[in-house]
């Protein structure tokens, strides 16, 4: 990719609160420098601040850049602004999360993990380890699913990919499965609810995206007698699992411990995998994603 002009891009991310976003920023900065383009990379203080992100997107449109990058916190909240950008002739490139239902033609490309498939991958690796424990359990077993929200495409699909694949694998082994907890995940999963399930998928979503609330969700799941595993669908949830476990010390891969699996990396998660607190994590390529955003913005501007 080569830039035909010294373009300026506006990029609206989900924030800077995780090392993941710092890595995306690094990739974008390096590629912008290589191509001779400039960018303004912004994001809200918290991934709960949807209204702030919409305001940032409106400001980005008013700056009249060659193109805009957007990692949408909500699949619905940005639609009016996306229509405005389209009317102004400013192409939008999605990253990290897509914007399903965006006004037609407003989002020209998307740089993201296949989040549903990534959730399925986490489930496949997890089920391999849990299979014997499910078979040996006399009663029901509970698998916790921690999602930081029920609004962004990436978080929802990583959760649903995990839920649907665990259910598929468990049902293939002859078990009944149900999903309980957060309504969005219960309704959107492929699992038919049943009262007498062998495998319970229990979805916890905090009222706001804070480390404290998610750590409390983790502790609630760890304190349920039938919990055998917890899955966190991003860096926020994975780190909250580590924090929530500090006083309880229930996570691990021993027979009487709760298996912890998560998403993304970062110092805390890598250390937790290394010391055995977490069994493993599915990681993305955030630096490459940042570079890909700049490439796609440049191609759109060209």
Spell out what each predicted region is:
Residues 1-302:
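A residue-level marker of the well-folded mature domains of exported/periplasmic proteins
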């Amino acid at each position: 990719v080569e830039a035909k002009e010294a373009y300026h891009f506006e990029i609206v991310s989900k924030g800077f609160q995780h090392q993941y976003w710092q890595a995306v920023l690094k990739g974008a900065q390096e590629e912008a420098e290589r191509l001779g383009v400039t960018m303004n990379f912004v994001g809200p203080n918290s991934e709960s601040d949807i209204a702030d992100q919409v305001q940032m997107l409106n400001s980005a449109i008013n700056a009249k850049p060659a193109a805009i990058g957007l990692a949408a916190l909500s699949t619905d909240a940005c639609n009016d602004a996306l229509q405005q950008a389209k009317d102004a002739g400013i192409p939008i490139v999605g990253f990290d999360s897509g914007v399903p239902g965006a006004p037609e033609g407003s989002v020209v490309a998307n740089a993201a993990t296949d989040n549903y498939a990534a959730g399925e991958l986490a489930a496949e690796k997890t089920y391999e380890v849990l299979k014997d424990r499910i078979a040996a359990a006399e009663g029901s077993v509970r698998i916790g699913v921690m999602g930081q929200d029920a609004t962004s495409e990436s978080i929802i699909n990583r959760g649903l990919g995990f839920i649907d694949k665990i259910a598929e694998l468990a049902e293939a082994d002859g078990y009944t499965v149900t999903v309980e907890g957060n309504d969005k995940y219960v309704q959107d999963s492929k699992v038919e609810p049943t009262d007498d399930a062998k495998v319970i998928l229990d979805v916890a979503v905090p009222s706001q995206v804070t480390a404290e609330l998610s750590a409390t969700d983790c502790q609630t799941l760890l304190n349920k007698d039938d919990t055998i595993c917890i899955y966190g669908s991003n860096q926020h949830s994975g780190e909250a699992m580590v924090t929530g476990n500090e006083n309880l010390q229930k996570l691990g891969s021993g027979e009487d411990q709760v298996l912890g699996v998560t998403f993304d990396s970062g110092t805390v998660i890598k250390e937790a995998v290394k010391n055995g607190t977490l069994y493993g994590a599915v990681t993305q390529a955030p630096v490459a994603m940042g570079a890909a955003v700049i490439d796609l913005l440049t191609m759109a501007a060209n």
